Amino acid sequence: MVVVFENKAEQEVLGSPDAPYLTSLSASGARFTEFRAVAHPSQPNYLALFSGSTQGVTDDSCPQLLGGRPNLAQRLMSAGCTFVGHSEDMPTAGFTGCTDSTGRYARKHNPWVDFANVPASSNLPFTDFPRICPGCRRSPSSFRAFAT
């Protein structure tokens, strides 16, 4: 599981009464507190984290259509694992728009949507995470990520 905090300091989230589940997860995992951006603005960093490369993307424009290029989800699925990405403020499962009607969701934080070799069924709202993810504790063949 990878949890990405953007625009919030770690201490604003972990230990917060509004984030008990994330706080409980942090106690049993590795924390990469020195991870730094490879580019600015946001989107190239999410692509680099997810695929090992910025894919030549230098801005937050939408959509990026990156076809079947190698990425974390594709590699996990090729190894018999599962991948599900959860995105904060995404309005519905499988949503591929650039933003929602409120302007709170931004696809630039959701890199798996840009790759044709990641199934649309892997793209879920953050609100589904607490309901679905408890099973990932028991299953070593599951990987879940979400962006904030």
State what each model feature region is.
Residues M1-T148:
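N-terminal pro-sequences and low-complexity stem/linker regions of secreted or lumenal proteins
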